[in-house]
Amino acid sequence: MTKQEKAINLSESAQVDQQSVQPFPRSRKVYVEGSRPDIRVPMREISLDDTPTDFGGESNAPVLVYDTSGPYTDPDVIIDVRKGLADVRSAWIEARGDTERLEGLSSDFGQQRLNDAELAKLRFAHVRNPRRAKAGANVSQMHYARQGIITAEMEYVAIRENMKLQEARAAGLLNEQHAGHSFGANIPKEITPEFVRQEIARGRAIIPANINHPEVEPMIIGRNFLVKINGNIGNSALGSSIEEEVAKLTWGIRWGSDTVMDLSTGKHIHETREWIIRNSPVPIGTVPIYQALEKVNGVAEDLTWELFRDTLIEQAEQGVDYFTIHAGVLLRYVPLTAKRVTGIVSRGGSIMAKWCLAHHKENFLYTHFDEICEIMKAYDVSFSLGDGLRPGSIADANDAAQFGELETLGELTKIAWKHDVQCMIEGPGHVPMQLIKENMDKQLECCDEAPFYTLGPLTTDIAPGYDHITSGIGAAMIGWFGCAMLCYVTPKEHLGLPNKDDVKTGIITYKIAAHAADLAKGHPGAQIRDNALSKARFEFRWEDQFNLGLDPDTARAFHDETLPKESAKVAHFCSMCGPKFCSMKITQEVREYAAKIEAVDVTVEQGMREQAERFRQEGSQLYHKV
């Protein structure tokens, strides 16, 4: 530890990122209660102004939006990152009666870190003893689902996905929605707890929720649900502190990150992860091979199954919800990458390829896969089967190495399911638009509809600094075709470690892609927010336009750059066209004129009817005697 690190006592000094706890404008946190009082599902309600009298003068119902920010945006909750978040799930877990509280950490590395006095000032102070399944028990959500049990977690996500659709229909918010094209997905008009159970039992969806992460607000990943996004954080050997990583977490979930992966490769990985999990209301994923490599000082050849197994247990006992495991990088696939333009670009994939070549043995993650499953089901950690041979350039897309690994991931998925372990599949990468559908179709075929989770894909390689856009295009497409979760890409992709602004930009880009996919699939209620914003735009309700957007702050700032006065917030024009050329204003004038013409036409028509009736009453004679 450096002198500076020794001087910092995080258990005393750590503070929440103040930007992350600011309430959203005209929004309030609401909770929808389930069948029991401790199932309280958070949503964000956006209040809207009334329609101006010029436009008919009606009240506008508030709009509910999916909320990933946890208690950080609830003004009634006092946030203290030194203590972590409140417990959400322990009562549900205890009631099932199939877990036990351990006397302490069971991983060798976890015990070493706990006994290192020098780390005391960096350590999260309120570490619980971990839980584990009782001997012979399986505590995965898939296992419960296959037993016909609807867990509290399943009910929770059903309420969360449904977003009070019945009330929205009653309020007329669903009167306008285009029919979607879902490419064979089976999206019901209403998400019920039983439907959630069926999808998890079938393997088409997962609820990543480790029994040692009781702070998590359950969410679901699957093609028949809302498309989710993941945001990456994590330190590197070149910098970033524990407090900065927690700030990235809280900042990311504020803007809509459904899950977060901690990809730390620098110092204090164990301690950083503890702080992140204890303060995270969303599932946390990791790539355990990264930390295992740090334990052997970066020498891939020195990795062993025993060391990796201890790392899995260490992280499972901390509460990691899903592991990326690169078990599909087989020895026979490595030569297939030799003629690629960019070779093996996955860090985990390259580590395992190097180990295989150095020992001329099969990947130990593959040969010990059943043993990994035993660990996963003891803590309910979900698999995210890593695509270690994903293409790193569009030239390498859809090649033999990529699809060979995908077929192996399909085999491993079926092994995981035999153990009732939840599983999703990671995908590319760099893929031109015309090859994206083939990726999705191949994954559905090989992996029997297990959820697909892709990094983009990037659709072109010519835009360093703008890869959030090149990948957002591919993300929207593959989300429409059936991908369940999209891993965000920031503007810093290929260039450097993202800062807070980059994280926000990446998340907003991917929220757009995910929402566009939901619209295209015809997800029930997906168009409510679009309709509300479009109506606000036509009626010049500027504040409602800002507040209904994914990023109210940026929308307001852009508007105020040219029209900063408060009077501009009620003006019937913006700086794009000015007062005389605003299409919305002209359209309203056309409507008013048409209404007047219609009124005149009605008067004329009424007069004509009266004259016709008089004509008939007078005998229907064309001429009358004088």
UniProtKB/Swiss-Prot annotation:
Keyword vocabulary terms for this entry: 4Fe-4S, Iron, Iron-sulfur, Lyase, Metal-binding, S-adenosyl-L-methionine, Thiamine biosynthesis, Zinc
Extent of Polar residues compositional bias: 10-22
Role summary: Catalyzes the synthesis of the hydroxymethylpyrimidine phosphate (HMP-P) moiety of thiamine from aminoimidazole ribotide (AIR) in a radical S-adenosyl-L-methionine (SAM)-dependent reaction.
Oligomeric form and interacting partners: Homodimer.
Gene3D superfamilies on file: 6.10.250.620, Radical SAM ThiC family, central domain
Reactions mediated catalytically: 5-amino-1-(5-phospho-beta-D-ribosyl)imidazole + S-adenosyl-L-methionine = 4-amino-2-methyl-5-(phosphooxymethyl)pyrimidine + CO + 5'-deoxyadenosine + formate + L-methionine + 3 H(+)
Identification of the protein by name: Phosphomethylpyrimidine synthase
EC number from the UniProt entry: 4.1.99.17
Family that this chain belongs to: Belongs to the ThiC family.
Binding site for [4Fe-4S] cluster: C574, C577, C582
Sites where the protein binds substrate: N232, M261, Y290, H326, S346, R347, G348, D387, G388, L389, R390, E426, Y453
Cofactor: [4Fe-4S] cluster
One GO cellular component, as annotated: cytosol
Residue spans crossing the bilayer: none
Disulfide bonds: none
GO molecular function: 4 iron, 4 sulfur cluster binding; carbon-carbon lyase activity; zinc ion binding
Keyword Secreted assigned: no
Region (Disordered): 1-22
Repeat in keyword set: no
Alphabetized InterPro entries for the sequence: ThiC, ThiC-associated_dom, ThiC/Bza_core_dom, ThiC/BzaA/B
BP GO terms, sorted: thiamine biosynthetic process; thiamine diphosphate biosynthetic process
Pathway the protein acts in: Cofactor biosynthesis; thiamine diphosphate biosynthesis
Gene, per the UniProt record: thiC
